[in-house]
Amino acid sequence: MRDTAFRSIKAKAQAKRRSLWIAAGAVPTAIALTMSLAPMASAQSSNLSSDAVIGSIAQGVTDGLTDYLKPRVEELPAGEVTYPEIAGLPDGVRVISAEWATSKHVILTIQSAAMPERPIKVQLLLPRDWYSSPNREFPEIWALDGLRAIEEQSGWTIETNIEQYYADKNAIVVLPVGGESSFYSDWEGPNNGKNYQWETFLTQELAPILDKGFRSNTDRAITGISMGGTAAVNIATHHPDMFKFVGSFSGYLDTTSAGMPIAISAALADAGGYDANAMWGPVGSERWQENDPKSNVDKLKGKTIYVSSGNGADDFGKEGSVAIGPANAAGVGLEVISRMTSQTFVDRASQAGVEVVASFRPSGVHSWEYWQFEMTQAFPHIANALGMSTEDRGVECAPVGAIADAVADGAMGTCLTNEYDVTGGKAQDFANGRAYWSANTGAFGLVGRINARYSELGGPASWLGYPTSSELKTPDGRGRFVTFEHGSIYWTATTGPWEIPGDMLAAWGTQDYEKGSLGYPTGAAVEYNGGLRQQFEGGYVFRTSNNQSYWVRGEISKKYAEDGIFAQLGFPTGNEKLINGGAFQEFEKGNIYWSASTGAHVILHGDIFDAWGAKGWEQGEYGFPTSDQTAITAGGQTIDFQNGTIRQVNGRIEESR
């Protein structure tokens, strides 16, 4: 089973010679060749050398056996997208967008100068006090993915509870997305459709983004699993001034000893069809030495180094085990390689006088549940290295008063903070959201995407004010909404969360809210020619420049949205009116008329409009317009109707039927 004991170099000096290179005898021939048996089954019978063990295991992982390590393909939840403008970044680097999956989980899409071929995603889990301490800076904890990293999101957020674990801690958790088989390294050249330059991106491009745009205090820890563990140590040795802590969970910390180049080459070929020569050049070259953790361990002196590994023994079903199922055969062999190479690294560190917190477990295989466990075991050492206070490592908290009553059903989860002051009232953070209280509104808890949008707008300090309800289900069952002092936020899975000002909400309500022809909002209310415009699934709601609110829907709204039409018509002066055979809507400078046979068309106030009106409007001789009113080259205006044309030429009305 996994134990929780940690041994420093000094503590295990006497046992140093129990190198896992010698202990390779604990790996049976059957494992080395077929990776099908538990490693302790014939511990006394195998006399394989370490390079033979590694080479044989490598041979076994070349046929897709590491597919089990590929995280489930899960898209991140769609969120509100913002477009941060961060000054002072390196040339060619910018944050294209920031998508808020929750109020504490943001997905950055970054244009990289080092890897310009495609945008790069990075997930950030924001600190506990991100909102309650808006002027504070926080340390960073990087968590690198494994060999089978996918492009949708980090394996850490798919396969572990990292988001929940760090929710009550005051650190920015940094999760690069993608990088399959990259070792997060700068590659020698393009390969397999990729031109990996991950180390440059992470250290020269991402770090300034966090510093200048996300309130980093530049104190950093870097960790990783498997391939990411190797990368974490390599990046830290190449940039020792950037990191105070480096952690490897089942990493390969010896890349050049006999058998390891073969193993790495086999792994890259298996996980995506990559050529290791494109990564660090020919085996034995200077680049391989530069990316050999054991050879550069002296550069980490003075830093906190955490190294962990199992030994390949399947402990599923045993007391204290964190395993969620029987071991995968490849997971056994890969963990054996990790154990042997990690031991070599620790031994080399001892020779160099570099202290390592080594946590070698008496069991465990190459799998996510073990790495989740190591994440929790490493955190106290991370916190010490980053100088985090006791309060920043977690909280002892409890809801009180009205907020306690509002969250009594447990839906908000455990508290992450105590109650704190916000503009005009109080707030308290919980695992699933945030609760708000003011004397005028009482206390309500908000969760999910609506809470994230409210937080992004500024929470109680925004124009919405305080919530006056918790999250409610819409009558049509499709969405959710929360009411506030000065408006509401409505959400559906397809439209996202959007806030509606109170007066525009009232106008929308005349169409039966989301059940009516306008449907749900699809964007925020935006400034529009001295007023506001908000788009809905079936039209728009406008606030005019004199603070009147009206809706425009259907074909009339489509016509009104065409280029140049607003300049012709101005704001609506009323809502759509149904008439015999169709509908029309009045605007400041004219009307739009619609019928099923003619479509929607514009007619302007003036002599043509008056002449048409004298003949009974759309119910009279001419019928509905069949074209928009337009200018003519001779100087004047013209418009066609179902039964004729009316023109104004040089101030004179001409009618033809």
Curated annotation (Swiss-Prot):
Keywords: Secreted, Signal. This is Protein PS1. One of its GO terms (cellular component) is extracellular region. It comes from the Bacteria. Residues 1-43 form the signal peptide. One of the two major secreted proteins. It is found in: Secreted. GO terms for molecular function: acyltransferase activity, transferring groups other than amino-acyl groups. Coiled coil: none annotated. Gene3D superfamilies: alpha/beta hydrolase.
